[in-house]
Amino acid sequence: MRKSRAIAAAIASLSLVVAACGGDEETAPTESSAETTSAETTPAETTPGETTPAETTPGEVDYMWTPNADVLAGAEGQVNIVAWPGYIEDGSTAPEYDWVTPFETITSCQVNVRVGATSDEMVQLMQSGEYDGVSASGDATQRLMSGGEVAEIDLAEYTSYADIFDGLKDKPWNSLDGKPYGIPHGRGANVLVYNTEAFPDGLDTWAPMWEAGSVAEGAVSVYDSPIYIADAALWLMATQPELGITNPYALDQTQFDAAIALLESQEAIAGQYWADYVVQAGSMVDGTLLAGTTWQVVANFAEGEGAKIATTKPAEGATGWSDTWMLSTKAANPNCMKLWMDWISSPWANAQATEYFGEAPSNRKGCALTANADHCTMFHAEDEDYWTDVWYWTTATEECLDGRTDVTCVPYTEWVNAWNALRA
């Protein structure tokens, strides 16, 4: 999923450049683990508008976090986590971005991270039982919850949860049967990017992504992932209401077939299918991309490199994501994982992590702590109205997510098969 967000260390630092200047396939796990041991690294304290090294020993008050005393007392000494690139940083990529060292100092839990490249890989890794927890996207969370790989959590053990934006709590991608299964990390929308010379009057519609005859024909950039089928369904929601689609992740066979047919027709106008967002940013800069689906952080970087582009969330709405930190049912170090989940969602750490990656924080107090004072405005962190027509990535299931019981919906495994056939 978005995750060919598979940014290597150098790619992950792309969002640092932004701050300074203003598809899954069924793959086998790869050996890309990294052990984070930062005992000799000076932790970084961030205040609004600047990034400076901390002058005090890491502690609860400095980092706006008071861990649950009982959980802290049971800390095992280490934690093994599967995470997206850029979500767990110890200062080795960029010294000023280090939210691992303070955590290790406060909790005595050494952080060991296995970087995941795709949601499918991360599900496989969690099924191995070797990891204590994971940062999971919505196309993985349902599989993990229904498969018994992750545990229901006791919110009383998480002191940071009260400050999470209400719009991220109790959602289908982080809860099951009304019970919480994780802590929200952040959120982002998949926005429309367009070349301002090709569209001097601006754009407020996804039409150039789907319809022939626009100036963007042949220069359309498409996200290369099965979850993009939801984007096709979103367009059909707006343009073919007779199909009855009310949720782009709840498609019966007729609706699904219509989405695939639309994607097949899109091939004639597409100029690029992207998974590596650095490649897409290059297309924005060199002008070979005239319209596309992107993430705001990619557009920010490209604009800083001189790309003549603008972004918008079109009138039809958009898909998006909200990742969730989850605890393994087989965790060997459950208390250290609980502490990490609470820490990474606390104001200071959440501000650091989400600004580094380029997304809206999940903790409302984090907005006062980002190095770029405009970060939360740029990513609409506090604008709940912005998110009302953003359909967060969710795993499609046979049980229709829109509440219908008279039909069976197409499960995500079939989305993967259909996408692979389309791209073949």
What are these regions (language model features)?
Residues 282, 388-424:
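Conserved C-terminal helix/tail region of periplasmic/extracytoplasmic solute-binding proteins
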Residues 327-393:
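Mature extracytoplasmic/periplasmic domains
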Residues 160-163, 260-266, 305-329:
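Periplasmic-binding protein-like
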Residues 15-20:
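C-terminal motif of bacterial Sec signal peptides marking the signal peptidase cleavage site
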Residues 191-198, 234-236, 321-333, 352-356:
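A bilobed periplasmic-binding-protein/Venus flytrap-type ligand-binding module shared by bacterial periplasmic
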Residues 21, 58-143:
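Early extracytoplasmic/lumenal segment of secretory-pathway proteins
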Residues 21-31:
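Bacterial lipoprotein signal-peptidase II cleavage site
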Residues 80-95, 130, 135-283, 288:
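Extracytoplasmic ligand-binding site segments that recognize negatively charged/polar headgroups
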